[in-house]
Amino acid sequence: MATEAAVREVLARIDAAWRLKQFDGLERCFHQDATIVGPSYVEYARGRNKCAESYVEFATNAAVLSYSESAHSLNVWNNVAIYTFAWEMEYQREQGSKRENGTDQLVLALGTEGWQLVWRYIYFAPAA
């Protein structure tokens, strides 16, 4: 259970960064070779700094109007963890508001720097 708590701590720090603009320690949440991909596995960010910057950019430039999560699942095996969830969000940027929903799949690994996100896949459900 202590292992699961350590994984959840990293997930909570990442969540606090984009939702509460609490960026302290965000970079440490990502492995140096972390990758974020989207639909069709298009690469959005690669490397610790770029992944952290993507969260800072969204938190700084988008106003989240509504957000909810469901279907949480966390599985931990020795030094690997997979966390998945579904989400719905409405947010505002300069171009206007946008409503999206989808799922996230996060893979974390336990290394010399503790638990870190190594891979994130973001799926956006097709617009209805």
Residue spans for each PLM region:
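Short helix-adjacent coil turns
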Residues: 14, 20-22
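Hydrophobic/aromatic beta-strand elements that line small-molecule binding cavities or substrate pockets
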Residues: 55, 69-74, 87-89, 103-109
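Short, cysteine-centered beta-strand-loop-beta hairpins and adjacent loop/turn segments enriched
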Residues: 89-99
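Short beta-strand edge/turn micro-motifs at domain boundaries
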Residues: 101-128
